[in-house]
């Protein structure tokens, strides 16, 4: 049978052939574009033979945990889609910025000096967004074609509408679906049903009715077919203290014209109910989503809403028996976002949005929580260190040029997505769920630790703990200043903003490290099997104080998001210890962090700590931990991530 050809531009084909010849088959495989991956028959054979989907995919995610025919059909065309996306970006860069720039970008992308995330959908879908559910609450399923929509009238109907909304949004994007105002609207519809005694509901049943709605939501978003028929939707839910609630929703109205501000205390209590019920569910089913962010305002060394802060820390960090079935709370399943201003919030995985920056506040308090990213393209900082060892000036000049090139690539991707919208191919935009006004272009980075190690700016004490030197602190600030200056200069004549993110790098971290091993075998930092997605990677031994210090030092530069994960070998054994730890971290100026635990599950998927299930008595069969930003079973991780997990350091917080 004749070969099946894909029509691509001559310039792109010529350049790709040159890169193949220059860098060899290993780099083609690293890009997911080797002959074996582009061959459907070879891909099928490899898919069947590998242990996990993550090891077979060219763009792995531990959220895709089950090998079945739908997974195969979804993963198989990824290499071809990626090829088409790279071609389109190259073609458009060539048109706008010139042939030399297009070739430079493609070579850096090919050699993993740059890394376009979700590359197989880079020219088809945007990345992530935090959605405002106001239109859904007031109109119903307004985004569906040929569908006579009307607003929900009841609690259960609204939750079902949210499920459809998430599915619609998730399948037309490649990243997280943030839901900052989900709970206020759930409260509204629940209260409406209670006030009207819907279906004869009496007061003693009100709480149970509320909890059933939470169950309905949590089970739905964790079904493994919501996105692309192969995985659950990456959903984020925001939990706010009283100060955040008032600032964000003080001027908002519910569908019946009542003001949210009149119900803030009740909404706060509904948030508690939501998290308490989700914790109860986790006992019988170890679920991944939603990922929570608990937003707390802190001024002058204390939490402004101290009662809510105390409740949140107890709920997240303290293992408490909640019923006679030996079920517990305290799953460490929420990120902490602690700031001295309500103009920022965290959603969409690591995305930190400055509400003032994008004009989210209106004169009566503001409710437009919409914020997201068109796409993320990451700079391999470790590569620059290998190319310019111990030459700060050379490093920073090369970094400036790389940032500018990255901005050009992201600019092209943004314009391609815009044209997709104009062609009517992205109804999530045309129906108003997402808009470009609230979408950043995001520059990612990885490899800060490896940069400092290459420059000799990391010291190790007699106990084996690694510390950044004063030179590392100063050089790190210079790196981020160059990134910000370069991106701000590029954006001067643009109608959008560019932000900066320390990427999770679930699969990118290993690919970038592998590329550097092939190009710089003798000088690459070999401390870990992949590059760290923390300022001091979780597999590097250091003191807790140093980990927090460095994260706090660099955190403010990451307006696109950064989170410090603090691995703990066992849950806090007292509230006082957890309270003191959270306050200590906040006092160091670290705004976004999470405690990361090891959670066990038995064959019935009951969750617990230790080796024996307290619910059914069966032994531990799986272990769960944050692979990057969310809990998944470690046996679904790629081989590189499993190796990294074995090297992670765990803090004793009870000593």
Residue ranges and their predicted role:
Residues 208-219, 453-454, 632, 641, ...:
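Metallocofactor- and cofactor-centric catalytic cores in central/energy metabolism, strongly enriched
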Residues 444-447, 560, 629, 640:
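Glycine-centered flexibility sites
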Residues 436-445, 642:
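Core of folded catalytic or high-affinity ligand/protein-binding domains
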Residues 3-437, 458, 464-469, 473-614, ...:
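Conserved catalytic cores of very large enzyme subunits
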Residues 184, 441-454, 626:
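Contiguous, well-ordered alpha-helical segments that form the cores/surfaces of helical PPI scaffolds
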Residues 460-463, 634-636:
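Short, surface-exposed acidic
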């Amino acid at each position: 049978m004749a070969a099946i050809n894909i029509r691509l531009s001559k310039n792109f084909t010529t350049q790709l052939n040159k890169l193949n010849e220059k860098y060899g088959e290993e780099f083609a495989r690293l890009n997911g574009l080797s002959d074996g991956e582009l061959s459907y028959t070879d891909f099928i054979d490899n898919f069947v033979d590998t242990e996990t989907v993550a090891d077979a995919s060219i763009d792995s995610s531990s959220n895709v945990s089950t090998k079945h025919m739908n997974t195969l059909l979804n993963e198989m065309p990824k290499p071809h889609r990626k090829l088409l996306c790279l071609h389109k970006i190259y073609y458009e860069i060539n048109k706008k910025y010139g042939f030399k720039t297009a070739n430079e970008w493609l070579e850096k992308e090919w050699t993993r000096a740059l890394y376009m995330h979700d590359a197989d959908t880079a020219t088809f879908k945007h990345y992530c967004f935090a959605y405002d559910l106001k239109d859904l609450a007031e109109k119903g399923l307004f985004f569906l074609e040929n569908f006579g929509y009307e607003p929900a009238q009841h609690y259960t109907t609204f939750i079902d509408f949210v499920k459809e909304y998430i599915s619609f949004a998730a399948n037309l994007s490649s990243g997280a679906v943030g839901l900052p105002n989900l709970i206020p609207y759930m409260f509204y519809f629940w209260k409406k049903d209670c006030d009207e005694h819907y279906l004869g509901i009496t007061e003693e049943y009100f709480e149970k009715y509320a909890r059933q709605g939470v169950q309905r939501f949590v089970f739905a978003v964790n079904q493994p077919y919501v996105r692309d028929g192969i995985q659950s939707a990456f959903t984020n839910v925001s939990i706010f203290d009283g100060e955040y609630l008032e600032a964000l929703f003080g001027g908002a109205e519910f569908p019946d014209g009542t003001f949210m501000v009149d119900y803030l205390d009740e909404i706060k209590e509904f948030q508690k109910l939501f998290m308490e019920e989700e914790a109860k569910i986790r006992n019988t089913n170890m679920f991944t989503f939603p990922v929570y962010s608990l937003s707390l305002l802190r001024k002058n060394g204390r939490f402004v809403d101290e009662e809510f802060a105390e409740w949140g820390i107890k709920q997240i960090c303290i293992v408490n028996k909640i019923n006679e079935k030996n079920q517990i709370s305290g799953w460490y399943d929420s990120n902490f976002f602690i700031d001295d201003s309500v103009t920022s919030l965290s959603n969409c995985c690591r995305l930190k949005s400055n509400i003032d920056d994008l004009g989210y506040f209106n004169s009566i308090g503001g409710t437009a929580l919409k914020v997201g990213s068109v796409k993320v393209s990451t700079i391999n900082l470790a590569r620059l260190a290998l190319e310019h060892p111990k030459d700060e000036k050379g490093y920073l000049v090369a970094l400036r040029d790389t940032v500018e090139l990255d901005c050009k690539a992201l600019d092209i991707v943004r314009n391609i997505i815009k044209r997709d919208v104009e062609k009517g191919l992205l109804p999530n935009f045309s129906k108003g769920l997402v808009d470009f006004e609230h979408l950043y272009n995001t520059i990612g980075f990885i490899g800060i630790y490896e940069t400092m190690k290459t420059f000799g700016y990391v010291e190790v004490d007699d106990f084996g703990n690694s510390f950044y030197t004063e030179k590392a602190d100063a050089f790190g600030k210079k790196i981020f200043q160059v990134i910000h200056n370069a991106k701000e200069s590029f954006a001067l004549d643009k109608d959008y903003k560019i932000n900066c993110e320390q990427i999770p790098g679930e699969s990118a971290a290993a690919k970038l490290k592998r590329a550097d091993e092939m190009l710089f075998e003798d000088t690459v930092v070999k401390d870990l099997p992949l590059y760290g997605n923390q300022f001091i990677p979780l597999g590097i031994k250091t003191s807790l104080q140093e980990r927090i210090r460095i994260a706090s030092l660099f955190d403010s530069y990451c307006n696109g998001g950064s989170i410090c994960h603090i691995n703990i070998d066992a849950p806090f054994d007292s509230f006082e210890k957890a309270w003191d730890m959270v306050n200590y971290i906040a006092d160091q100026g670290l705004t976004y962090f999470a405690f990361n635990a090891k959670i066990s599950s038995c064959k019935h998927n009951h969750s617990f700590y230790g080796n024996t299930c307290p619910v059914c008595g069966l032994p531990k069969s799986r272990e769960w931990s944050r692979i990057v930003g969310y809990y998944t079973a470690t046996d679904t991780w790629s081989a590189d991530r499993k190796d990294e997990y074995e090297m992670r350091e765990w803090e004793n917080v009870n000593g």
